Design a protein with these regions (language model features):
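Conserved AMP-binding/adenylate-forming core of the ANL superfamily
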Residues: 15, 25, 33-78, 82-86, ...
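Conserved pre-ATP/AMP-binding loop-to-beta segment of ANL
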Residues: 32, 143-144, 158-165, 172-194, ...
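Conserved structural elements of the adenylate-forming
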Residues: 50-58, 172-177, 191, 205-227, ...
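Structural core segment of the AMP-binding/adenylate-forming
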Residues: 62-63, 90-169, 494-496
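Adenylate-forming
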Residues: 76, 121-131, 147-148, 235, ...
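AMP-binding/adenylate-forming catalytic core of the ANL superfamily
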Residues: 102, 109, 119-121, 279, ...
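Conserved AMP-binding/adenylation subdomain of ANL enzymes
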Residues: 213-230, 238-278, 292-293
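Conserved AMP-binding/adenylate-forming
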Residues: 272, 305-306, 313-331, 335-437, ...
């Protein structure tokens, strides 16, 4: 032991576990009268937000919820969802945010697997939740959320109440001065998120308080959030806990603008009326903004930061967003990394680049997020790092405090994911000389044709360069001669038409002949609720 190891012990005065709940507590103390939440006509200050979250935690505790229990929520982007992100972990319990697009079988699996003791359900989803509860083995307390701002002309009808009490009644039971519980350890679980489950049942990904707290700071840095940002909820809060933004805004005393449905008019109204500074979403949200009807569009004065994930947006989309007043930042991550763990951090000197050189920079995923300790491209078996040559393909791997604790009740999957002391993403990419990574494909999406590897992303990029293409997805089609060949599924922009032969010829002008799709099918491309293309659905379609 050295001199710095003696008589310098950890104690309550010099160490407290990190938790994002402290972000809200501080904002309520320092900025009690600032508006924290906007939802239709409703306005809630930070003092009210904190008090209601404490009431929720208190009410749950009085009903027996304690450390290590699971509270499931199936809620839209509403104030109740924001309160659940704070009130549930205040008891020491773990928040499970259920994807609102799931079917009853998967919901029932998640309720049983997580051993959910309480379910908070928005009445928009009461029908599927009622069906799921009939299939599930657990018998949780069911609480209905009746959104007072649910529009009368909604595209879907509000379902019946299925619970034993209503959300506001539950909150009213609680104490606004509730002495909530700090985690015993910052490694304690704060939330549970399930993977998409494209093969078999989904895996339960466990987040801890430390990672969630650090993501609060990291999001502020990566998104360039100054004081009092205004954040529009176009990203579902159930998706990786909304990339941890429910916990982020309080760091800078920002305002949450809730949005139940992503509609062009509602987004432009929020941008113009509330001075929105930041939003997140898949490329489909950008397309909705760019292609909005003239009657839905409104002018706004501020420059808006738009964080997007999934595949890098085509240059035409980026140009359209810039012209409309948005600065697009490309992020990359997985459920297992709390959402974004890589950011394409733009450099001022790149603004002087010509079109092709600039496009090459925007096509990359980027560098490690501020809260991530290390990011590497490695050989998945030998664990040797690939050279930074922009050509040698390896598996993208993560290491740091915003990597999950592991998969719930699945030690084998956790051990495999963490093999060699790194989280294995399953994504294939290259490392460029300047340290930026670029994805080339998912391991399962590489097409091997005649012994040659074809990146489906490269083929999709070529298709996106055609002015009539709105969405493109390329998968492998079994072929007796070549083993596999590229098959493209394409959605055209409204009112556009192009032939299969024209698109194949377009690709041949941009790709090696063996990389070009041999067949193109024009149809709607299936996507998840967050806008990600579901290639496994397309694979099933071709057998």
């Amino acid at each position: 032991m050295g001199i710095y190891d003696e008589h310098l012990d950890r104690n309550a005065a010099n160490y407290q576990p990190l938790t994002p709940l402290s972000h809200l507590a501080r904002a309520a103390l320092v900025h009690p009268d600032r508006v924290a939440i906007i939802h239709g006509a409703l306005r809630r200050t930070y003092a009210e937000f904190y008090a209601r979250s404490r009431r929720l935690g208190s009410a749950l505790e009085r009903r027996g919820i304690a450390r290590g229990d699971t509270v499931a929520v199936m809620l839209s982007n509403t104030p109740a969802m924001l309160e659940a992100h704070h009130g549930v972990p205040m008891t020491g319990a773990v928040l499970l945010s259920i994807n609102t697009r799931l079917d009853a079988d998967i919901i029932a699996f998640q309720l049983d697997h997580s051993e959910a003791r309480v379910v908070l359900v928005d009445r928009e989803f009461s029908g599927v939740m009622a069906e799921a509860l009939k299939k599930a083995k657990v018998t949780p307390l069911v609480v209905d959320y009746d959104d007072p701002d649910f529009p009368a002309d909604a595209p879907v009808a509000k379902g019946p109440a299925i619970g034993s009490l209503e959300y506001e009644a539950l909150v009213a039971e609680g104490d606004p001065d509730y002495a909530w519980h700090m985690p015993n350890d910052e490694w304690d679980a704060i939330s549970l998120n399930y993977t998409s489950g494209t093969t078999g049942n989904p895996k339960g990904v466990v987040y801890h308080h430390r990672g969630a707290a650090l993501m609060g700071y990291a999001n502020v840095i990566a998104s360039g959030m100054g004081r009092y940002p205004v954040y529009l909820w176009t990203l579902p809060m159930f998706h990786c806990n909304g990339w941890c933004f429910p916990w982020t805004l309080a760091v800078q005393a920002g305002t949450h603008v809730c949005l139940r449905w992503v509609r062009a008019k509602a987004m432009f109204d929020a941008l113009a009326d509330h001075g929105v500074t930041h939003l997140c979403g898949a490329p489909v949200v950008m397309a909705t903004l760019i292609n909005a009807d003239a009657g839905d569009k409104r002018d706004f004065d501020q420059t808006v930061t738009f964080n997007t994930a999934a595949a890098p947006p085509p240059q035409s989309v980026l140009s359209g967003m810039r012209d409309a007043g948005f600065e697009v930042t490309h992020l990359y991550g997985l459920t297992e990394t709390y959402g974004p763990a890589v950011v394409n951090e733009w450099k001022d000197e790149w603004n002087a680049l010509d079109g092709p050189a600039r496009a090459a920079k925007t096509a990359r995923q980027g560098v490690r997020y501020p809260a991530l300790e290390d990011l590497a491209v490695m050989h998945s078996e030998t664990m040797e790092k690939t050279p930074a040559d922009g050509e040698t393909i390896g598996e993208v791997m993560f290491r740091g405090n915003i990597v999950m604790r592991g998969y719930l009740k699945n030690p084998e999957a956790s051990a495999e994911a963490f093999r060699g002391g790194w989280f294995h993403s399953g994504d294939l990419g290259v490392l460029h000389e300047d340290g930026y990574i670029e994805l080339k494909d998912r391991a399962k999406d590489i097409i091997i044709s005649g012994g040659e590897n074809i990146s489906s992303i490269e083929v999709e990029d070529a298709l996106y360069q055609h002015p009539d293409v709105a969405t493109a997805a390329v998968v492998a089609k079994p072929d007796e001669k070549w083993g596999e060949t590229p098959l493209a599924f394409v959605e055209l922009k409204p009112g556009r038409s192009v032939t299969e032969a024209d698109l194949i010829a377009h690709c041949r002008e941009r790709l090696a002949r063996f990389k070009c799709p041999k067949e193109i099918r024009f149809q709607e491309v299936p996507k998840t609720s967050t806008g990600k293309i579901q290639k496994y659905v397309l694979r099933k379609a071709i057998g």
